[in-house]
């Protein structure tokens, strides 16, 4: 089981999907899950979708990246119910998730990744 994974939470399914595509170009092998939008396909953040993204992660420690405040709130609520350690990052979504993913793919440690993106 991998030690560290990446979770992306966006208000837009298109942003989440596009960011995963971008990341997979530089980090094809890392544990990566993403969610965006609401059940009806609209914009927003869903507790249930975030919970699925976290629960489907094979890693037990997760670097979580989000776009707007309610996405962070949903990450915080999911963290309360999860056995996984979720490290919510307050960095720009695309740049932060991309850099962290590339570093993780290259074998950087959690400490090294956090020092580079913060």
Regions found by a protein language model. Give the residues of each.
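N-terminal loops that bind phosphate or other acidic moieties
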Residues: 1-118
